[in-house]
Amino acid sequence: MFKREEIIEMANKDFEKAWIETKDLIKAKKVNESYPRIKPAFGKTHPVNDTIENLRQAYLRMGFEEYINPVIVDERDIYKQFGPEAMAVLDRCFYLAGLPRPDVGLSDEKISQIEKLGIKVSEHKESLQKILHGYKKGTLDGDDLVLEISNALEISSEMGLKILEEVFPEFKDLTAVSSKLTLRSHMTSGWFLTVSDLMNKKPLPFKLFSIDRCFRREQKEDKSHLMTYHSASCAIAGEGVDINDGKAIAEGLLSQFGFTNFKFIPDEKKSKYYTPETQTEVYAYHPKLKEWLEVATFGVYSPVALSKYGIDVPVMNLGLGVERLAMISGNFADVREMVYPQFYEHKLSDRAVASMVKLDKVPVMDEIYDLTKELIDSCVKNKDLKSPCELTIEKTFSFGKTKKNVKINIFEKEEGKNLLGPSILNEIYVYDGNVIGIPESFDGVKEEFKDFLEKGKAEGVPTGIRYIDALCFKITSKLEEAFVSNTTEFKVKVPIVRSLSDINLKIDDIALKQIMSKTKVIDVRGPVFLNVEVKIE
């Protein structure tokens, strides 16, 4: 914490001096904890749920009430709604099936089998019979069966399961039997039930909407069809309702999603639950995508179907696929990849890859960590010294109860060179999925690489790590290791950089996997000609 009174006193005496000197009180984060290796943490919504919420709000703004329609629909309702067309429609429905409950008796043979497992049945026979009978009658749930058998025989649940497997094989041989109940394949099957019940409960006209899941037995799933999808559907019931209401609702709803201009084209399908010549496809123009898109269907329910549900006023229904709208809004090409991204390839952005490039070794001790900055500054300042030359830094550290005198000598003995090589100030960038070392200046860079490197510097994501930075951390990290191991001297020599590890850098496996799979590159090659000798006394 700051010593506020001292700072104020210093500022009162000499504000400029206090302003400059107090900057050291703001400690910089360590390299692996600095930007871009730190990222803001936030959650992420799903595009389908985003679209559902946007549709909900759009319907509510238009004065609709939200309802949840039944998901499980008896096939009789499909016949009532579709008439003779029902058989063809039911082909796309999923039927619900369940396992039958076998009539399992407790014969002498089964009692003998149980007793062979070392369990006395005589005292518990009646209790066991009651449990089996209760299961058959449906008064006992299947997931409680093992527990109840175990309790009745006063045995462990593991032994109860063994009895079920070995003595009562009837349970293993069960085959599901289909019922007459179906999973809703479209929202209409639910609207007839809902509107029918509300006819004597709500004053006419009324406007309802529901956004929920439907199930359709597609022959196969592809880039535009799934076996389960969300329908955003509405129904308006009242005298005078006709297809003009459908047109107005379509425009009012879809204009809230950026669509302009609408075409209403008669649907060739002519479903029997709609009044003839009312089933209509809605095409809308999206100025961003610059194309006309089919986005919804509406129609007026047939008086024949309505009458079977006790409904004696017109009902207009409009529906659209949520996933379809989400694909348009998010510019997705494949509904499967949009809905289930976890099962498809995930592409990391350059920003994300940059956050995964880190120093491999970093000293833990603050004093040694702070030495790194001094070492970096000295190297940058003296990098162009003409050889033979050397740069020496001496420091004394307290390590436990001992003093460590450290002498770091950076040198170049060969004549006609600089203290450090030309790539020493290269910085690591991530550009178009590639991890590359980009020089401070493009003087002397071959023309075949120049354009790519210039674009990388202008458009890529800088990691903020130069070769000299990472290498100096390598030196100070080895110095710390030498303190711990009581080593008195060591050398660091890096002539040519060929890989990240040569400059004390590492990259997360996730990023590395993407780079390899996308045939991208990690290219950090360059001459640094670093020669270091460190002595500790």
UniProtKB/Swiss-Prot annotation:
Binding partners and assembly: Homotetramer. Interacts with SepCysS.
Family: Belongs to the class-II aminoacyl-tRNA synthetase family. O-phosphoseryl-tRNA(Cys) synthetase subfamily.
Enzyme class: ligase
SUPFAM superfamilies for this protein: Class II aaRS and biotin synthetases
Name of the protein this chain belongs to: O-phosphoserine--tRNA(Cys) ligase
GO MF term list: ATP binding; phosphoserine-tRNA(Cys) ligase activity; tRNA binding
Catalytic activity, EC: 6.1.1.27
Function: Catalyzes the attachment of O-phosphoserine (Sep) to tRNA(Cys).
Chemical reaction(s) catalysed: tRNA(Cys) + O-phospho-L-serine + ATP = O-phospho-L-seryl-tRNA(Cys) + AMP + diphosphate
Organism: Methanococcus maripaludis (strain C5 / ATCC BAA-1333)
One Pfam entry name: SepRS_C
GO biological process: translation; tRNA aminoacylation
Residue sites binding substrate per the record: H186, M187, T188, S231, A232, S233, Y273, Y274, N317
